[in-house]
């Protein structure tokens, strides 16, 4: 049996950060634009932009910097705050996964009996 996976959601007074928002930031870093990141994740540009806006509000500072489109095309990239947010989230996720490893194995064994 495959090991159960732990999914991390962090509830802050300003809002919630979870795997979907972090995946969007990673896709923006990889794709170089909000619209391409949204397409890669199967979401509309509007939904992607709304999530970026929410992350900017949660962080209290821009996590994505976007340049307008046009003939030369636009683009987007993560700010230092955005890169830090992704790194912190992934580090917390890894620590939580390691801390829960034994209990997840016990849960899996209990559920397969």
Language-model regions: role of each:
Residues 1-13:
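Short, Lys/Arg-enriched N-terminal segment that forms or immediately precedes the first helix
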Residues 15-25, 46-49:
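Short alpha-helical elements of helix-turn-helix
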Residues 28-39:
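Short helix-boundary/capping micro-motifs
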Residues 54:
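Alpha-helical DNA-recognition elements
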Residues 57-62:
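Residue cluster at the C-terminal edge of the helix-turn-helix DNA-binding motif
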Residues 66-89:
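Basic, amphipathic "hinge/linker" alpha-helix immediately C-terminal to the N-terminal HTH DNA-binding motif
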Residues 88-107:
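Alpha-helical linker/hinge and terminal dimerization helices associated
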């Amino acid at each position: 049996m495959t090991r159960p996976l732990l999914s991390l959601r962090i509830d802050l007074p300003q809002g919630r950060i979870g795997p979907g928002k972090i995946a969007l930031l990673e896709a923006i870093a990889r794709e170089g634009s909000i619209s391409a990141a949204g397409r890669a994740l199967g979401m509309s540009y509007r939904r992607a932009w709304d999530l970026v806006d929410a992350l900017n509000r949660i962080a209290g500072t821009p996590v994505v910097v976007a340049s307008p489109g046009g003939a030369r095309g636009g683009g987007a990239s993560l700010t230092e705050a955005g890169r830090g947010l992704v790194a912190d989230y992934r580090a917390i996720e890894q620590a939580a996964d390691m801390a829960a490893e034994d209990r997840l194995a016990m849960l899996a064994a209990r559920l397969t009996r």
